[in-house]
């Protein structure tokens, strides 16, 4: 696959997702980093987004709840280049009915090469990165070339 460059803006579009057993962990992380997160555009799956808004008064673009299609909505935003960072505290010890959606979301984040945190330690590394508030170039698939090759 040919690659091209995408510039993540200084003001990031950040998706926040958490499974039920991890919501409190994400809430604590968000509250701890609220001054930094307020400088960015936030998205979240439905329940998580509403909980964050209620607890912090931050503006969060809430999708549907994860099991109702919210994970897929976030994945679509990633594939459209509208999400720059994914913070996804998923529960590795409990299966969820929408496991295929979870796998698809993580796959899309990997395909489009955006930073992903699946636990507090990694989320802390990302938000404390010297690049977090800077524009950063990343390599992504060159979809136009991909499509042109497929249509030959």
UniProtKB/Swiss-Prot annotation:
Entry's Gene Ontology BP terms: methylglyoxal biosynthetic process
Keywords recorded for this protein, A-Z: Lyase
Alphabetized PROSITE patterns for the sequence: METHYLGLYOXAL_SYNTH (PS01335), MGS (PS51855)
CDD domains: MGS
Presence of keyword Ion transport: no
GO MF terms, alphabetically ordered: methylglyoxal synthase activity
Catalytic activity: dihydroxyacetone phosphate = methylglyoxal + phosphate
Highest taxon above the source species: Bacteria
MGS-like domain sequence ranges: 6-152
A GO-annotated cellular component: cytosol
Active site per UniProt: 71
Residues annotated as binding substrate: 19, 23, 45-48, 65-66, 98
EC number(s) per entry: 4.2.3.3
Function: Catalyzes the formation of methylglyoxal from dihydroxyacetone phosphate.
Family from the record: Belongs to the methylglyoxal synthase family.
Protein name: Methylglyoxal synthase
Organism expressing this protein natively: Escherichia coli O17:K52:H18 (strain UMN026 / ExPEC)
Gene behind this protein: mgsA
């Amino acid at each position: 696959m040919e690659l091209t460059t995408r510039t993540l803006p200084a003001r990031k579009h950040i998706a926040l997702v958490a499974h039920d057993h991890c919501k409190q962990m994400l809430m604590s992380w968000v509250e701890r980093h609220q001054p930094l997160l307020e400088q960015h555009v936030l998205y979240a799956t439905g329940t998580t987004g509403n909980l964050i808004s209620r607890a912090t008064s931050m503006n969060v673009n809430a999708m549907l709840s994860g099991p109702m299609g919210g994970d897929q909505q976030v994945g679509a935003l990633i594939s459209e280049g509208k999400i720059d960072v994914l913070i996804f505290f998923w529960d590795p010890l409990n299966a969820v009915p929408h496991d295929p959606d979870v796998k698809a979301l993580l796959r899309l984040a990997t395909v489009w090469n955006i930073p992903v945190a699946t636990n507090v330690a990694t989320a802390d590394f990302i938000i404390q990165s010297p690049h977090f508030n800077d524009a950063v170039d990343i390599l992504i698939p060159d979809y136009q070339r991909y499509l042109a090759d497929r249509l030959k």
